A protein has these predicted regions:
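N-terminal entrance/gating region of PLP-dependent enzymes' catalytic architecture
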Residues: 1-77, 337-342, 370
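Conserved C-terminal alpha-helix-loop-beta "cap" of PLP-dependent enzymes
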Residues: 6, 117, 247-258, 281-371
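Hydrophobic face of alpha-helices
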Residues: 57-60, 64, 90, 172, ...
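Short glycine/serine- and small hydrophobic-enriched flexible loop segments
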Residues: 69, 95-99, 272-277
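Conserved PLP-enzyme active-site core in the AAT-like
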Residues: 76-77, 81-246, 266
Length: 371
């Protein structure tokens, strides 16, 4: 067996067993294999063609139009591009917020993804961490107490639409209530919908986080629920914010509006292929199947004596942290005394049953040791 086969087999085997990360497993893009022999570069703004004509910008624009639609907007009022992932999308949203309000303070909960602190450091923005509730949602009383002392300063609200560990959703209505109560006139709302951006539009009741609710920017992961071999994301913003930072670059013949200059041209192709094949109805069915799987796992875990719970209609099942051996075998993300299983497309009930049997054995061994 050569080294390349060894690498492939290791990754393939580990892909089959993981349960703790939000990555779909049921995709195949084999028909795009010939593209691996090409350098595809979507340099610059997706809406303007470059002097470098080896891109997939037509397909990228179709993707952006699709996401504008499911986020209750259109490409006249909003603009976006395919990013390298959720972190870049959050960086871009915070960058636009800073350009709008250079003296603002960013408010975000302690359950926010670790990369956001790094983004805030890179952008050198003043920020304050807000406490979280037990379910991972922002503590609005704490936000109110903090904001009350800073009501005269511009504010940037960084809201989580599905936290990393518990899939908690910060309530936009609560934040808007506080904004109104303290008459904050200069503010910007960014939503980190890395995981739920492709799920929440099809959940009942639908979380409030899109452009119809007055948000300014939204970051979404493209490779998680949709699935794909290369990490990617989508960032959507109000067009007026993008226009504020746009610069023309003559030698590439396009506008400079994105974080990176050279941009991956393969990932828009994968997203475009998924959208063409499945559309909104396909995403809706995908969400329903994953929710049913999560409900099954939550019920079965509690049946065998493992305390488990979910936020409303979540795909993330939070459970008491199992042994190191089980966490390693199933690649479970854990924090303090909890771990989680995320019921993504491609995970089958049979795999969950094997996981449940392993937990049963572990519980039986613990009971025997106590006798």
């Amino acid at each position: 067996m050569n080294e390349i086969d060894q690498i492939y087999n290791r990754i393939s085997e580990n892909t089959n067993t993981f349960l703790g990360y939000p990555l779909a497993k049921d995709f195949s893009y084999k028909e795009f294999a010939p593209f691996l022999d090409l350098c595809i570069n979507n340099v610059g703004d997706p809406e303007s063609d470059s002097t470098l004509a080896i891109d997939t910008k037509d397909q990228e624009r179709e993707c952006i139009s699709f996401f504008a639609d499911i986020l209750s907007s259109n490409t006249k009022d909003t603009w976006g591009y395919v990013t390298n992932g959720g972190t870049e999308g959050n960086l871009y949203g915070l960058y636009l917020a800073r350009e709008s309000y250079p003296d603002a303070v960013v408010y975000y909960s302690e359950s926010t993804h670790y990369s956001v602190k790094k983004n805030l450091h890179l952008l050198n923005i003043n920020n304050i961490v807000v406490r979280s509730q037990d379910n991972g949602e922002m503590d609005y009383d704490d936000l109110e107490q903090i904001l009350m002392l800073r009501r005269d300063k511009p504010a940037i609200f960084f809201l989580n639409i599905g936290t990393t560990m518990t899939e908690a959703v910060d309530k936009l209505d609560e934040v808007k209530r506080i904004i109104k109560k303290y008459a904050i006139k200069d503010y910007y709302i960014h939503c980190d919908a890395a995981f739920l951006g492709t799920i929440a539009p099809f959940v009942t009741p639908k979380p409030k986080f899109d452009f119809s609710e007055g948000v300014d920017s939204i970051a979404i992961s493209g490779h998680k629920f949709i699935g794909g071999p290369i990490p990617c994301g989508i960032v959507m913003v109000k067009r007026k914010h993008r226009d504020r930072i746009a610069n023309s670059v003559s030698y590439v013949g396009t506008l400079d509006t994105t974080i990176t200059g050279s941009r991956n041209g393969l990932t828009p192709l994968f997203l475009w292929a998924f959208i063409k094949k499945h559309g909104k109805e396909g995403l809706k069915n995908r969400v329903k199947e994953s929710q049913e799987l999560a409900a099954y796992l939550e019920m079965e875990l509690n049946k065998i004596g493992v305390k488990a719970w979910r936020n409303n209609e979540a795909l993330t099942v939070v459970l008491e942290k199992p042994s190191k051996e089980i966490c390693k075998k199933y690649q479970l993300a854990s924090e303090e005394n909890i771990a989680h299983v995320i019921c993504m497309p491609g995970i089958k009930k049979e795999q969950l049953n094997v996981f449940l049997e392993d937990l049963k054995k572990e519980l039986a061994e613990i009971l025997c040791a106590l006798v």
